[in-house]
């Protein structure tokens, strides 16, 4: 699924539509009927990690809400490119279970909300958007087929939801799951792209006696971090993905957190500048030093298994005898 930098970009694309009324709807969503948005006003947009939250109200009145993400060294002053390419056919990764997911905590029971029905008139209408593997948002345009499918047909991706607004523009949502939800309670201290990201909390999590590649994907401590960031940060910190956090020196754990934040911010900045993502190990056959890259699926016994790329020479596996320093990058 799209990682933190991509969802931040989606938030930036949606934000100009806040304060506008939905005048026409469309899309293929069956659990949440597109017609439910007719005549509603988009009043707020919030992002946390890999999730986007949109608030809709039946009237034009707006409450002052601090919904914008923390600016990252002025990059929000740059104009976003209005298109996010949707790659390939619709596909979604399995979502992690509630244990250890670290998702925003609802402020009241979600049982009062229904996937396909709008909440009662006195309830805030918060739409929770979870993007699939090729999830995207397009502005004032539709995604087009880049290649033929397995049957040889050139079929354009089918949008899950299309919202036309009173200002004349429209938003198109692809490959995502949507549901009405209670108002989100956002915790920026675990968001890797927030200026309030809590390094101490992250370092403490990384000191656990479990493979660091498991801990990095725990959204309770690294919200917004996905498989690409995991692989890149581990390689740049020269840490083997199965190294136990308790066996790493404090300086190695600090270097890993540094690379997580640095790569995430650089990736987001590249998105806003229309540049290609630059990876060193993810989906590579050789590392930058010319060594053969290994690929294997790792994950907790009862959790999601994820493809992992690493270089055995640049990222040697440690013994479990105690904290060890790793080769510097």
From Swiss-Prot:
<comment type="function">
    <text>Involved in base excision repair of DNA damaged by oxidation or by mutagenic agents. Has DNA glycosylase activity towards 5-hydroxyuracil and other oxidized derivatives of cytosine with a preference for mismatched double-stranded DNA (DNA bubbles). Has low or no DNA glycosylase activity towards thymine glycol, 2-hydroxyadenine, hypoxanthine and 8-oxoguanine. Has AP (apurinic/apyrimidinic) lyase activity and introduces nicks in the DNA strand. Cleaves the DNA backbone by beta-delta elimination to generate a single-strand break at the site of the removed base with both 3'- and 5'-phosphates.</text>
</comment>
<feature type="active site" description="Proton donor">
    <location>
        <position position="3"/>
    </location>
</feature>
<dbReference type="GO" id="GO:0006284">
    <property type="term" value="P:base-excision repair"/>
</dbReference>
<keyword id="KW-0863">Zinc-finger</keyword>
<feature type="zinc finger region" description="FPG-type">
    <location>
        <begin position="280"/>
        <end position="316"/>
    </location>
</feature>
<dbReference type="GO" id="GO:0072686">
    <property type="term" value="C:mitotic spindle"/>
</dbReference>
<keyword id="KW-0862">Zinc</keyword>
<feature type="active site" description="Schiff-base intermediate with DNA">
    <location>
        <position position="2"/>
    </location>
</feature>
<dbReference type="InterPro" id="IPR010979">
    <property type="entry name" value="Ribosomal_uS13-like_H2TH"/>
</dbReference>
<comment type="similarity">
    <text>Belongs to the FPG family.</text>
</comment>
<dbReference type="InterPro" id="IPR012319">
    <property type="entry name" value="FPG_cat"/>
</dbReference>
<feature type="binding site">
    <location>
        <position position="227"/>
    </location>
    <ligand>
        <name>DNA</name>
    </ligand>
</feature>
<dbReference type="GO" id="GO:0005654">
    <property type="term" value="C:nucleoplasm"/>
</dbReference>
<keyword id="KW-0597">Phosphoprotein</keyword>
<dbReference type="GO" id="GO:0015630">
    <property type="term" value="C:microtubule cytoskeleton"/>
</dbReference>
<feature type="active site" description="Proton donor; for delta-elimination activity">
    <location>
        <position position="306"/>
    </location>
</feature>
<keyword id="KW-0511">Multifunctional enzyme</keyword>
<keyword id="KW-0378">Hydrolase</keyword>
<feature type="modified residue" description="Phosphoserine">
    <location>
        <position position="68"/>
    </location>
</feature>
<dbReference type="GO" id="GO:0008270">
    <property type="term" value="F:zinc ion binding"/>
</dbReference>
<dbReference type="GO" id="GO:0140078">
    <property type="term" value="F:class I DNA-(apurinic or apyrimidinic site) endonuclease activity"/>
</dbReference>
<feature type="region of interest" description="Disordered">
    <location>
        <begin position="88"/>
        <end position="112"/>
    </location>
</feature>
<feature type="modified residue" description="N6-acetyllysine">
    <location>
        <position position="150"/>
    </location>
</feature>
<feature type="active site" description="Proton donor; for beta-elimination activity">
    <location>
        <position position="50"/>
    </location>
</feature>
<protein>
    <recommendedName>
        <fullName>Endonuclease 8-like 2</fullName>
        <ecNumber>3.2.2.-</ecNumber>
        <ecNumber>4.2.99.18</ecNumber>
    </recommendedName>
</protein>
<keyword id="KW-0539">Nucleus</keyword>
<dbReference type="GO" id="GO:0019104">
    <property type="term" value="F:DNA N-glycosylase activity"/>
</dbReference>
<keyword id="KW-0007">Acetylation</keyword>
<keyword id="KW-0326">Glycosidase</keyword>
<feature type="modified residue" description="N6-acetyllysine">
    <location>
        <position position="50"/>
    </location>
</feature>
<keyword id="KW-0479">Metal-binding</keyword>
<dbReference type="InterPro" id="IPR015886">
    <property type="entry name" value="DNA_glyclase/AP_lyase_DNA-bd"/>
</dbReference>
<dbReference type="GO" id="GO:0008017">
    <property type="term" value="F:microtubule binding"/>
</dbReference>
<dbReference type="InterPro" id="IPR000214">
    <property type="entry name" value="Znf_DNA_glyclase/AP_lyase"/>
</dbReference>
<comment type="subunit">
    <text>Binds EP300.</text>
</comment>
<keyword id="KW-0227">DNA damage</keyword>
<keyword id="KW-0238">DNA-binding</keyword>
<dbReference type="GO" id="GO:0005737">
    <property type="term" value="C:cytoplasm"/>
</dbReference>
<dbReference type="Pfam" id="PF06831">
    <property type="entry name" value="H2TH"/>
</dbReference>
<dbReference type="GO" id="GO:0003684">
    <property type="term" value="F:damaged DNA binding"/>
</dbReference>
<keyword id="KW-0456">Lyase</keyword>
<keyword id="KW-0234">DNA repair</keyword>
């Amino acid at each position: 699924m799209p990682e933190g930098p991509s969802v931040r970009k989606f938030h930036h694309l949606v934000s100009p539509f806040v304060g506008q009324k939905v005048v026409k709807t469309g899309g293929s969503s069956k659990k949440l009927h597109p017609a439910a948005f007719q005549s509603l006003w988009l009043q707020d947009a919030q992002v946390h990690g890999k999730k986007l939250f949109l608030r809709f109200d039946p009237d034009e009145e707006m409450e002052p809400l601090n919904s914008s993400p923390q600016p990252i060294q002025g990059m929000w002053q740059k104009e976003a490119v209005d298109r996010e390419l949707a790659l390939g056919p619709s596909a979604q990764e399995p979502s992690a279970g509630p244990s250890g997911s670290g998702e925003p905590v609802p402020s009241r029971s979600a049982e009062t909300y229904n996937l396909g029905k709008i909440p009662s008139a006195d309830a805030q209408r918060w739409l929770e958007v979870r993007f699939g593997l090729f999830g995207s948002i397009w502005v004032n345009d539709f995604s087009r087929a880049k290649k033929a499918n397995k049957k040889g047909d050139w079929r354009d991706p089918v949008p899950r939801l299309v919202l036309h607004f009173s200002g004349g523009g429209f938003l198109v949502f692809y490959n995502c799951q949507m549901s009405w939800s209670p108002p989100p309670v956002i915790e920026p201290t675990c968001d890797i792209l927030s200026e309030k990201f809590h390094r101490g909390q992250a370092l403490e999590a990384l000191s656990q006696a479990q493979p660091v590649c498991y801990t990095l994907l725990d959204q309770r401590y690294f919200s917004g971090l996905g498989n690409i960031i995991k692989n890149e940060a581990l390689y740049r910190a020269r840490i083997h993905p199965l190294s136990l956090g308790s066996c790493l020196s404090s300086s190695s754990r600090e270097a890993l957190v540094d690379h997580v934040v640095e790569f995430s911010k650089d990736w987001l900045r590249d998105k806003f500048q229309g540049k290609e993502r630059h990876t060193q190990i993810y989906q590579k056959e050789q590392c930058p030093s010319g060594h053969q890259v290994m690929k294997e699926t790792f994950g907790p016994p009862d959790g999601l298994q994820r493809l992992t790329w690493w270089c055995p020479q640049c990222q040697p596996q440690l013994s479990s005898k105690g904290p060890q320093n790793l080769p510097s990058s």
